[in-house]
């Protein structure tokens, strides 16, 4: 390979790595306001981007989500997965259930010690927590895919995720990175 090619390749890698590091260094995070039905991207405490008319779980929200309840979990999470092509257009998975959710569920008898330990170990290792426990899983932010925009605008229709239009999720993809903080309130 020529020296010029290698220098060009190195320059491109530095630009891409620098862009990713810049996103993380600015303390960029997501706030989902389920009362106002708005998702905002913030840098510190300054709002950089807002997406209106989001949809949440068809049964509302809860601090204590259970598998199949169609509710969006409340709390503080991290993005653990970025899938650019899914049936819902794009999917940005969060680390639900968190240790806080698992602790409350253990105290309430919703899960046993074995599930609590599995969730605790996964979160501690910064891995995706088990998704098949009685607390449910596969929660994230996604588009509507081939779904109807009119239904999205009028109804909360998800099984617990946060949904944006495909155009909104495409725009949001410029901001997201694995490890990004997501607050759902």
Show which residues each predicted segment covers.
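Bacterial N-terminal signal peptides that target proteins for export
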Residues: 1-7
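N-terminal accessory segments that precede or flank the first globular/catalytic domain
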Residues: 2, 18-44
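Bacterial N-terminal signal peptides
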Residues: 8-15
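N-terminal post-signal-peptidase region of extra-cytosolic proteins
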Residues: 23-28, 34-35, 52-81, 123-126, ...
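Exported/periplasmic cell-wall-interacting domains
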Residues: 25, 85-185
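Solvent-exposed coil/turn segments that connect beta secondary-structure elements
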Residues: 35-37, 44-46, 54-59, 82-85, ...
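Short, solvent-exposed loop/turn elements at domain surfaces
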Residues: 39-42, 50, 61-65, 87-90, ...
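Short hydrophobic/aromatic-enriched beta-strand-loop microsegments
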Residues: 49-52, 182-184
